[in-house]
């Protein structure tokens, strides 16, 4: 186990073999990675340095299916996003939850496990009112989180560099990462004391 700067409260894993088999067949030139329960990654083919953190090991493709994992990541840099979306839609990933990033990037998690399902657990555990939720994101995998926040009366903020459909799903669009969008959102709430 390594220091990630946080302690997981719950890690939900699944067997990635079936879904990886479908993806490898349909996207033979893609790059694949799996996140193990301890937060480390195994990957096949290069991933950007920022994507997997420091604890990652390059491994043969067949090694990826041998572990229970909390996430499968697929990167297909040679494809346009629309083409990638079409391939993923044709595969029909019905036994897992998945979200497409703002490039040809796919995150796959156990069925029913999403950012919003995890955040709802945290919200309930800490007694936070639904209308006090602030969700900030920039990728297609954040749309479900915005919908969850807004359904409870909270606010979804899209980062300025996010794709149009992500911005359209949010309550408000803030500045880009480069222009300190998150800091601008948080400074707008400075001095507000939320009560339970």
Predicted feature residues:
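Conserved acidic, metal-coordinating active-site core of Asp-based
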Residues: 18-136, 140-145
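Short acidic-hydrophobic, aromatic-tinged amphipathic segments that line or gate anion-handling sites
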Residues: 10-12, 56-59, 157, 173-177
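Glycine/small-residue-rich loop that forms an oxyanion/phosphate-binding "nest" at active or ligand-binding sites
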Residues: 1-17
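Structural recognition of alpha->loop->beta junctions
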Residues: 1-4, 65-66, 167-173
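A generic secondary-structure micro-motif detector
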Residues: 9-10, 74, 109, 152
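Mg2+-dependent phosphoryl-transfer enzymes with acidic/Ser/Thr/Gly-rich catalytic loops
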Residues: 109-196
């Amino acid at each position: 186990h390594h220091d990630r700067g946080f302690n997981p409260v719950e890690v939900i894993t699944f067997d990635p073999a079936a879904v990886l088999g479908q993806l490898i067949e349909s996207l033979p030139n893609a790059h694949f990675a799996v996140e193990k329960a301890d937060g480390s990654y195994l990957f096949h083919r290069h991933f950007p340095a920022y994507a997997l953190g420091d604890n990652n090991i390059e491994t043969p493709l067949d090694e990826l299916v041998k572990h229970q994992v909390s996430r499968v990541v697929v990167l297909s840099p040679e494809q346009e996003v629309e083409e990638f979306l079409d391939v993923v839609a044709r595969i029909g990933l019905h036994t897992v939850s998945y979200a497409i990033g703002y490039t040809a990037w796919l995150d796959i998690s156990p069925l029913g496990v999403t950012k919003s399902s995890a955040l709802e657990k945290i919200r309930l555990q800490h007694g936070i009112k639904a209308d006090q939720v602030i969700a900030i994101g920039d990728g297609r995998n954040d749309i479900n989180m915005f919908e969850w926040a807004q359904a409870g009366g909270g606010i979804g903020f899209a980062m300025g560099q996010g794709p149009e459909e992500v911005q359209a799903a949010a309550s408000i669009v803030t500045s880009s990462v480069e222009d300190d969008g998150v800091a601008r959102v948080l400074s707008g709430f400075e001095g507000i004391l939320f009560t339970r």
